[in-house]
């Protein structure tokens, strides 16, 4: 691919975002247990990075070693840069864990007891716990010609044990493997009277390493070390060749745990020859090995804040607000009839969305409900409401995206339950994931003495997931606007039926009109600038990668358009480059909540067009997904979106990171006045 304009590398951008997440763990303004949580989040993000992005890069290197990445670098060069940066990030994680977080936790009476410091009473308690709770479920595997190296599951905790001596059959023991079942707790609370601390804990790895000899009787344990293998987690389902996507996925899901190895994690003290054996057995190189100065899976430390009753070391809980127009009304339909409703999560509650669906399920005047589901969780009151509606005789149609990564099994289960109660379940369009967030309710109403059907719609930037609605920032719109409702109806027609593209009045839809409409809007701002008029673009999203949109932004900036981009994660556009992008700023907001809404603002000669969307500016969202962008037409609500979703974050000087012209980020520091957008919005809505 020839590159006309510069692009920053995607993989390095993802690692850069995780560096910003990890920086939260070093921020003294963040409560201590939340700082630990940010370390765990970084670890979880890295797991997914290796399972998906690094796995894909390694596949590309094998299949087409001479290819270039979209930024123009060779794949080998990208791989080398990614490995170097990932190694540094992992080292920084463990340094921060030991030098900053664990030290501070001990000062607060929260302590991890290492085996080297156990006294006699603690050792006896640990021994009893091992024999009572662990030994019955552990299966040691001795390695010999009859017991080859096991194919360990993706991201499972394992121990490699060096042994000396002969077993009961006279075999010379060399090495064994112990796999820790996922059901075993990774953190075990030590009784306070033994610990000496209000909250004392022992890691599962400490217990296993101390007593692993009990699994190999009469043999000498020379070493015992943790290891963990990360595997390629992409599912290989050829949608063109299968007749039933759900059945095909159910057959493919178990293989995810046994994909090609991508990364080996070992404890820092693992002997070199043991590491070599693990790499050889996994088919990995030295560069694919990451040394952990602590637990190899930091994600499991996420349990600690829930196990410790110390509210002073956590974020102050917030109670999302209920908008007055909703709180003061019995019927959600009456509320929407009086005007559009805008919800700003997590500052405002997700409950009105659920209440709308619950009322629709029970309302005898409701005849049909249509809903998209991408992620909703394993215990979803929203799905219960849909099933209740189907039982009550409503025409319920649910577009369930079975290929939502890492939620496939959950969505398959929901699809089965929905079908069992009589709902129509479809899986979208082959080759295009349904990522749009839409709910459509059709209801009989009386107008002028006549009965007619009226549509009500909810559109959102985030998932129909009550739990993440308390953790992610998103906007949702409830409306009975005739044109928007008709557009949503047409999109559902395309998802459930077969036919030509239907013309939409208000919505921009991928894979048809979203990309060209966006390009058209950017070009219109450029024309305003060339004519000497005010021109402005402000856009907020999770990721910006699509090359043609980036090229349009560069050209608009050169025409004089002032462009402010708020991109939480990876951004391939390079701001502040002389002669190219001096008029563009890029900032990333990393704070208590995960920034998730997508907002597109165009000054448009003073008309101020504002769109909300489920779509990031990426190839997949424009061309390989079903997405919608919807306008905010109500003037009051438009001012809210601009103020709460854009201006507040442009003024943030506590959680904002500004991208420099070389692609690196620098944290914005408060001057005389400190401004934190998320905390300000919490104060506004939740005080």
Curated annotation (Swiss-Prot):
Post-translational modification: An intermediate of this reaction is the autophosphorylated ppk in which a phosphate is covalently linked to a histidine residue through a N-P bond.
Annotated S-S bridges: none
Catalysed transformations (reactions): [phosphate](n) + ATP = [phosphate](n+1) + ADP
Annotated active site: 435
GO molecular function annotations of the record: ATP binding; metal ion binding; polyphosphate kinase activity
Binding site for ATP: 45, 472, 568, 596
EC top class named in words: transferase
GO terms classed as biological process: polyphosphate biosynthetic process
Coiled-coil boundaries: none
Gene3D superfamilies: Endonuclease Chain A (3.30.870.10), Polyphosphate kinase middle domain (3.30.1840.10), Polyphosphate kinase N-terminal domain (1.20.58.310)
GO cellular component, one term: polyphosphate kinase complex
Binding site for Mg(2+): 375, 405
InterPro entries from the UniProt entry: PP_kinase (IPR003414), PP_kinase_C_1 (IPR041108), PP_kinase_middle (IPR024953), PP_kinase_middle_dom_sf (IPR036830), PPK_C_dom2 (IPR025200), PPK_N_dom (IPR025198), PPK_N_dom_sf (IPR036832)
Function according to Swiss-Prot or TrEMBL: Catalyzes the reversible transfer of the terminal phosphate of ATP to form a long-chain polyphosphate (polyP).
PANTHER family documented for this protein: POLYPHOSPHATE KINASE
Membership in a protein family: Belongs to the polyphosphate kinase 1 (PPK1) family.
The protein, known as: Polyphosphate kinase
């Amino acid at each position: 691919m020839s590159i006309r304009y510069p692009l920053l590398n995607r993989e390095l951008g993802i690692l850069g975002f995780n560096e910003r997440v990890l920086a939260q763990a070093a921020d003294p303004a963040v409560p201590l247990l939340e700082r630990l949580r940010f370390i765990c989040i970084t670890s979880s993000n890295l797991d997914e990075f290796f399972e998906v992005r690094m796995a894909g890069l390694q596949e590309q290197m094998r299949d087409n070693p001479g290819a270039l990445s979209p930024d123009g670098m060779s794949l080998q060069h990208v791989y080398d840069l990614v490995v170097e940066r990932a190694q540094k990030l992992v080292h920084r994680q463990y340094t921060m864990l030991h030098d900053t977080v664990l030290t501070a936790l001990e000062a607060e009476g929260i302590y991890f007891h290492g085996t080297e410091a156990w006294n006699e009473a603690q050792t006896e308690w640990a021994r009893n716990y091992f024999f009572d709770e662990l030994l019955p479920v552990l299966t040691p595997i001795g390695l010999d010609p009859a017991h080859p190296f096991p194919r360990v599951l993706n991201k499972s905790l394992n121990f490699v044990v060096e042994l000396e001596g002969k077993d009961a059959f006279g075999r010379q023991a060399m090495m064994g493997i112990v796999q820790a079942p996922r059901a075993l707790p990774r953190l075990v609370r030590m009784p306070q009277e033994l610990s000496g601390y209000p909250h004392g804990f022992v890691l599962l790895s400490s217990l296993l390493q101390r007593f692993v000899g009990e699994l190999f009787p009469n043999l000498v344990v020379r070493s015992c070390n943790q290891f963990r293998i990360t595997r390629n987690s992409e599912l290989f389902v050829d949608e063109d060749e299968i007749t039933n996507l759900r059945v095909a996925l159910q057959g493919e899901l178990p293989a995810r745990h046994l994909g090609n190895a991508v990364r080996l994690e070992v404890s820092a003290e693992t002997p070199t020859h043991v590491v070599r054996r693990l790499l050889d057995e996994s088919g990995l190189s030295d560069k694919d090995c990451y040394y952990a100065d602590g637990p190899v899976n930091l994600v499991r430390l996420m349990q600690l804040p829930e196990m410790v009753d110390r509210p002073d070391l956590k974020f102050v809980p917030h109670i999302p607000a209920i908008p007055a127009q909703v709180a003061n009304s019995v019927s959600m339909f009456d509320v929407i009839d009086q005007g559009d409703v805008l919800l700003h999560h997590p500052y405002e509650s997700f409950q009105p969305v659920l209440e709308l669906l619950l009322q629709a399920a029970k309302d005898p005047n409701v005849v049909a409900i249509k809903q998209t589901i991408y992620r909703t969780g394993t215990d979803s009151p929203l799905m219960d409401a849909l099933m209740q509606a189907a039982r009550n005789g409503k025409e319920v149609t649910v577009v369930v995206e079975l290929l939502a990564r890492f939620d496939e099994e959950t969505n398959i289960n929901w699809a089965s339950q929905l079908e069992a109660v009589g709902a129509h379940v479809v899986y979208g369009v082959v080759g295009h994931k349904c990522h749009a967030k839409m709910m459509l309710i059709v209801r009989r109403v009386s107008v002028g003495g006549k009965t007619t059907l009226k549509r009500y719609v909810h559109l959102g930037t985030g998932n129909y997931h009550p739990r993440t609605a308390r953790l992610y920032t998103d906007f949702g719109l409830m409306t009975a606007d005739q044109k928007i409702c008709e557009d949503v109806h047409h999109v559902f027609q395309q998802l459930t039926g077969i036919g030509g593209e239907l013309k939409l009045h208000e919505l921009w839809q991928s894979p048809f009109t979203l990309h060209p409409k966006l390009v058209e809007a950017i070009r219109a701002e450029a024309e305003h600038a060339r004519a000497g008029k005010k021109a402005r673009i402000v856009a907020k999203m999770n990721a910006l990668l699509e090359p043609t949109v980036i090229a349009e932004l560069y050209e608009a900036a050169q025409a004089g358009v002032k462009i402010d981009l708020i991109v939480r994660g990876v951004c391939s556009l390079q701001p502040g480059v002389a002669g190219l992008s001096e008029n563009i700023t890029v900032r990333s907001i990393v704070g208590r909540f995960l920034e998730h809404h997508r907002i597109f603002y165009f000054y448009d000669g003073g008309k101020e067009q504002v769109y909300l969307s489920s779509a990031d500016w990426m190839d997949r969202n424009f061309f390989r997904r079903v997405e919608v962008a919807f306008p905010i037409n109500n003037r009051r609500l438009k001012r809210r979106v601009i103020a709460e979703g854009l201006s507040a974050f442009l003024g943030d000087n506590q959680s904002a990171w500004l991208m420099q012209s070389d692609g690196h980020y620098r944290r914005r520091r408060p001057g005389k006045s400190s401004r934190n957008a998320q905390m300000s919005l919490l104060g506004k809505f939740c005080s």
